[in-house]
Amino acid sequence: MASIASGPAQRPLAAPPEWCRNPCNSRKRGTVIFADVLANPAALLPFVLIGFAAQLVDGALGMAFGTISSTLLVGMGVPPRVASAGVHAVETFTTGVSAISHVAHRNVHWPLFFRLVVPGVIGGVLGAYVISNVSAETARPVVLGYLLAIGLYLLWRGITHRHTEREPRIVEPLGLIGGFMDAAGGGGWGPIVTSNLLVQGASPRITVGTVNTAEFFLTLVISATFLFTIGLEAVSTATLGLLIGGVLAAPLGAVAAKRMAADRMLVLVGIVLIITSGLGLAKLLS
């Protein structure tokens, strides 16, 4: 007897991502990574050293962990959105330890903190959504060129001892833009926010401590957004190594920020901005 068709054939639904199909797979992924590390612990060491060095600079100068780490991961072939998600997952822990250290050393100005953290979180959520769905690389050359100019200016001010401390006026827009670029580019909160507050005359020690403390809440929200949009794709041996090195170095950065002279800090911030922005521009132009 011939079968009777009940209607037009329906197209099968697209299969959901692996981590959504089976929630246990996220646990399996973590198990595989730890098994790989135990089998070859030497593979973890380079990432531990990079995380330690990057966080030491970030804790003392308020920038560079995200930029250095993301550049490294992308250079090794990791997709930009996965690299950004992995770095922010690591920074959730490193910025938490760094924030506690800066608060303990009285490097935080709380009115400035609250003016930064709310727009920063809003910008971070928008940036995480953008990089998870579209490319945000169009604005990258402009941002890098701007940060290179800021680096040269801060270097000049530090060398010529022209830093006069005063209350910064433009804060909330910096938080919004810094949060957006940090999520969309895998790094940018420190370079954009710290450098522009220093240009306005804010105290280097207070600026670094406040920006780093606000960054904890920013990375927490960005990481949650990435987890919702791309899952646990960012978990890897590299992120585990960056996490270990970063957490070990986080308390030391706050001590360095407290003891470093303002002019010397401006010079070092300028040098870091010039190097990271210059390398980024060279890579884009090559």
Task: Give the location of each predicted region.
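Juxtamembrane transmembrane-helix boundary motif
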Residues: S3-I4, P8, P12-G59, A64-P80, ...
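Transmembrane helix-bundle signature of multi-pass membrane transporters/permeases
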Residues: Q55, S84-T92, V208-F216, L273
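Early transmembrane hairpin of solute transport permeases
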Residues: G75, A85-S101
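Small-residue-rich packing faces within the transmembrane alpha-helices of Major Facilitator Superfamily
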Residues: T92-T95, L148-G151, F216-L220, I274-S277
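Secondary-structure boundary/capping motif
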Residues: S98, W189, N212, L218-T219, ...
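Hydrophobic alpha-helical transmembrane segments of multi-pass integral membrane proteins
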Residues: I206-T225, T237
